[in-house]
Amino acid sequence: MEALGGYPTRSSNPKAKKLTVLLSMTVGVGCLLLLQTQLLKPRRPSDFYSFEVKDAKGRTVSLEKYRGKASLVVNVASRSEQTESNYRSLQELHRELGPSHFNVLAFPCAQFGETETGSSRDSEAFAKATYGVTFPFFSRIKIMGSEAEPAFRFLTDSVQKVPRWNFWKFLVNPEGKVVRFWRTDEPMESIRREVTALVREIILKKRVEL
């Protein structure tokens, strides 16, 4: 018996059946492999504190330790015209507001001329010896181009701006999101106001949660 239209109710071709089964199996295996690839593919961190970086001694450090605090992330240099004023102001800010609720996080960068020529340890030692800084220093990084440090690229992608000189500053909230950024020559007083306001919010929130 044939169905309406003259088509047989069952396939009478064994080869066609085998081909259909084989095709179905191939598609199924392909879907499973695609799903496995997606599951195993490393996920891009969704916030700044989800990244790992190297400290000045080359040791891997998880930025997770700073979650719950405000962070001012800065690309620093030892031989820039702005070095002295920035290091002194940053240390004062770190001393006044940190480290319980706030930290300055310094990343030396050598992509702007000869303003940073030493090693990561040299940069840290210079800042400590010359300006008495106590905030954390990390390994020297690149912040521009294909070799940019992923953690710093997260900052620049967040604001759609790439630093054009040393001492750009990115304010990161307790959840790891960038809330403000400042260029090199912007007054520290405006930065201080923004950071202080964020730190106050953190303190008030913790008091409410107690």
From Swiss-Prot:
Its main location: membrane. The chain crosses the membrane at residues 21-40. It is a single-pass membrane protein. One of its GO terms (molecular function) is glutathione peroxidase activity. GO terms for cellular component: membrane. This is Probable glutathione peroxidase 8. Pfam families: GSHPx. Keywords: Membrane, Oxidoreductase, Peroxidase, Transmembrane, Transmembrane helix. The keyword Signal does not apply. It catalyses: 2 glutathione + H2O2 = glutathione disulfide + 2 H2O. It is found in: Membrane. PROSITE patterns: GLUTATHIONE_PEROXID_3 (PS51355). It is an enzyme of class 1 (oxidoreductase). Belongs to the glutathione peroxidase family. One of its GO terms (biological process) is response to oxidative stress. Its EC number is 1.11.1.9. It comes from Tetraodon nigroviridis (Spotted green pufferfish). InterPro entries: Glut_perox_Gpx7 (IPR013376), Glutathione_peroxidase (IPR000889), Thioredoxin-like_sf (IPR036249).
